[in-house]
């Protein structure tokens, strides 16, 4: 079967935004204009096509990134047909893992910002993730029809807060209820959309007289940005003072793909204006799979290899999401980087070194699916029948193995105990939790050895709440949930030198003998555990050194203060002794463990607590209440900003342990008029009185 769309006309894009910037509505409009669904679904009615889990429709927020394929021939219908694969990403802080996961498989992104709220805390997180994966992006300023909408204020915020380099390619005509359309700076014409056809028809008109001067200024900035893409264009621009439309598009495209600039557009998705022009910008400025460097990975011999985005290359793909579908069972979403694969083919899961048969291949449109026979380089599809694949696994040609770079997922910061309500729920709960953990790498399940309770851990209260909710809906498991527990850590502030650990058992017959001497010191924050073998002259035989390391690693799981995991320590194994007959691996494992416990007690152990970056948006009247309350929660206020249309944004760093139930108390403090967002920032040392309370609570 030949390729329907040439790969240079593919665009794999994500649509990413802060919660409530109107991202789902924007995606809906894209699907509508590209002719995929003919009745526009509104989030207000809980009917948006992309938000396909029941809870998302109830909460009106997007949780799972559904992947959808759409086709576009340009706003005027005069361009070659392009294939746009859209990955819808969630905007809520507790779901940054979903965003991270989709960034990994995208070629470009469209960042949606609210014309009133502008750049919000979550926008900064998403921007950092896009920087990390070097994703070219454009900015779409939505909700231009809302009171307080200000395109140019958001332009300033993008520069100031995100250190972005936005280049407007359209500017708005009017704002708020007077927003009527945009001026296209490439054509220097006003675009007015026809409301009766829900924006499917439009006309080019002359620029309103009062906007001509400012449009000329913005056009000049845009042309300069394009000219900077190459010496030839710059010389032409300096000589002639102008560039052709094709030259401007090429210059802006090259710089967008190099992540030097971000084309900026605007509109109101809800009122059917501007999304159509933004789709044209996706074709103009965002890369196809062949415009970006080939994907790299590790070959069988341990060397680096790469895979070109071409059909004649060996097949390679990355599984980036697992979902349970009520009709077909487990779906594995994957991005094909190279080659072709057919349904029924055997592929190698190179990450796990297992061969699997690819059953059916489905192309997804939100929650509707179309069965297809093959996928090619650049495609995004879902597979049924892969039993062992999980998020981040590489699928490839069994004759030509490669492991693409793995995704790294953050550690959970909050835990809760869950208990099934009835006996039959017990078995179902185990199954449900395992299935959910398989879908979501930032969600962990473990059993507390002391209490026997099942503990679930995740990225925030909402994250866990939604997973418990899904257990009930999808698996019919009723569970009661304990109070949230904070994921504390332990580390050291001092150094303990030459600490002995000796494990000796001599009681007739063969004994046990292991002796290790270590020096323990703090490691850099975030570096974790490091083990340095500094044994000289064979005082501990080579084969026993890994056992000492293993013994220490087992002890790291529970620190000496309150049994929390130990982080950021460096161990030097400096000396020891052994016995010809009685020494064995187990004895050295025990010696390592004993030495570490003793050294940790001597090295000023401390408890670390997770600190959260909190942003509260509040009317000015309640400012005092909000700041006082944050201080009472051991918060450190780090700054304040004015909001458009009055109100303040308070930025603070607050320990997670003090933030439980914050939404309820914020509501009563401000009569429900303030909102907040919170995300994990870093670990920091808990004050003495807090540490003592934690230790006492643990020892009860």
Curated annotation (Swiss-Prot):
Gene: fusA2
Subcellular location: Cytoplasm
Domain of life where this protein originates: Bacteria
Organism: Paraburkholderia xenovorans (strain LB400)
General function of this protein: Catalyzes the GTP-dependent ribosomal translocation step during translation elongation. During this step, the ribosome changes from the pre-translocational (PRE) to the post-translocational (POST) state as the newly formed A-site-bound peptidyl-tRNA and P-site-bound deacylated tRNA move to the P and E sites, respectively. Catalyzes the coordinated movement of the two tRNA molecules, the mRNA and conformational changes in the ribosome.
Name of the protein in its database record: Elongation factor G 2
Family: Belongs to the TRAFAC class translation factor GTPase superfamily. Classic translation factor GTPase family. EF-G/EF-2 subfamily.
NCBIfam families linked to this entry: EF-G, PRK12740.1-5, small_GTP
Protein's GO biological process: ribosome disassembly
